[in-house]
Swiss-Prot record:
Belongs to the multicopper oxidase family. This is Laccase-2. Cu cation 3 binds at residues 164, 485, 543. It comes from Cryptococcus neoformans var. grubii serotype A (strain H99 / ATCC 208821 / CBS 10515 / FGSC 9487) (Filobasidiella neoformans var. grubii). Cu cation 1 binds at residues 117, 483. The lineage of its organism: Eukaryota, Fungi, Dikarya, Basidiomycota, Agaricomycotina. It is an enzyme of class 1 (oxidoreductase). PANTHER family: ADR239WP, MULTI-COPPER OXIDASE. Residues 70-183, 195-357, 466-563 form the Plastocyanin-like domain. Glycans are attached at residues 67, 124, 242, 286, 320, 358, 397, 430, 452, 458, 508.
Amino acid sequence: MGGIIKLSFLFCSLISLVNSENTGKLPTAISDHSVPKATATTDPSVFVLSNDFEITDVPTTREYTFNLTEALASPDGYERLVYAVNNMLPGPVIEANTGDTVIVHVNNYLHEGQGIHWHGLRQNGTALMDGVPGITQCSIPPGGSFTYQFTVSHQSGTFWWHSHYSNSMADGIWGPLIVHSPNEPLQRGRDYDEDRIVAVTDWMHDESETIVEALISSEGYRGRPFPPQGDAILINGRGQTNCTATGSPSCTYPPPPEIHVPVNCRVRLRFISAASHPMYRISIDNHSMEIVETDGTAVYGPTIHEISISSGERYSVIINTTEGKEGDAFWLRTSVALDCMAQGVTQVGLAVVRYTGNGSITTAEPRTEAWTDLARPDTPCVGLDEMYHLSPRELVNASQTALESRVLDSKLGKFVDVYGNSFEGYGFNNVTYQNQINDPLLYVVQRGGTCNSSLIANATFADIGPVNIIINNLDSHIGHPYHMHGTEFQLMGRGTGALTLDDLPNTNLTLDNPTRKDTIWMQGGSWALLRIISDNPGVWALHCHIGWHLAKGKMAVVVVQPEAIKKIQWPESWMDLCANTDPNAFGPARRSVS
């Protein structure tokens, strides 16, 4: 066993924590909106993955401390209250090797509960660490703490972590999570020379609480019932807003973020969409991009000028920095795909890709032009896995048959909450999710119970083997990115309309090495058949990753091996989160209506 690597990013203005991960209580008061806040910062160097990181198959323990606090920040030039992690926006990068144990001590100084999800990691044997309040745990209370511990097994690639409580991810609680392996198909030094993270997200000038409460009200947000377009686009935590539109005299126009890459190299760019709403289209002037990874699966993909990426997805591309000399600069363009927005305006976020060498860093802005074949604003929103065949580099064929198949019909509609209030929301199988946040479904099943089908749609698979999940997006004009917790899936087939169980025997499926992902963009009025192996006991969330849709109930669960779940041993620290809480209470709006 390798040595313990402690990487504690401590917020300097907080007093020392004394056994907080054991007591569940913090010695410092939770955030008070009336108290002046520290200023959260963005460190561009964290998005540069160092060649000094040792990629090895010798497992070790990587330990982090996350302090969640309120702070002030103006990542796009407009100052607002944010949720920072260790006074960073976005939060720290977690970097590990396959086989490593990751320990994260989360100290919650906020005025609301929290839970941290490790997006894309399977959590083999550690379902209770998946980080979803009301599904796999009770919330980390204000002034409380909790330690997540899990081993990264049989996975490598690009992942990320984020809050799964309400839509506070949109306030800043997220960060990249990169897993290396000496056995992964893409090798540093052979397939690429340098490694960079490019994380994109929409950014609102209002806090997520304000937006969610408005969306579930009759008035809507900014007079509309539909999720908003961002006020700005952030690239690696920085962007540029329209200061004139804000009406704020203190608004500034910051320089665009920069991504420095050595000249004459092969550079891997790991794109992560942490957006709460839009699909983005990303291009780099003068540079073609070879797609080599999606959602932690190394693939053979096309070389293209522009990628599309929806919330929760990750794509790695390789570019060759041979289009100029040291000091040259090129625009990286991130545009909102307007065809899948209810309403919207043309919005482009810019970053500078700058060639570096042995000399000093230049500062001139690029004068490059966009590719002439980029998508138009009204081009239909189509995922890359639908436009191209992304063939996994590690061959895994699918069986002709499955043990069982379940259907989840996804649709916007009128619903009534547990308090008798009527609202327009989203659901699966005519059920909108309402979250009994202090009685997690994983614990319900462990006690021998079942999921309440009037509160959440669910699919249960009792036995180990290949099983099918059919998602029918019945919203004819609304696309959704669906994310599966606890496993990746093989994309067996997709098409227009809806697929029923009666149709399945006559449906052509992809059996030869299907694309493997954990997040899939589905156009309105379409179906997709996802194949999983039901070998990881747990209650796993399956939901739309548009945070504002999730706020209005677009969540289901997949229950895998309920008999095995009954054998889970609950650590005392996990049980303490639920102590002295009302098990009949309903949770925040991202999971229900209140």
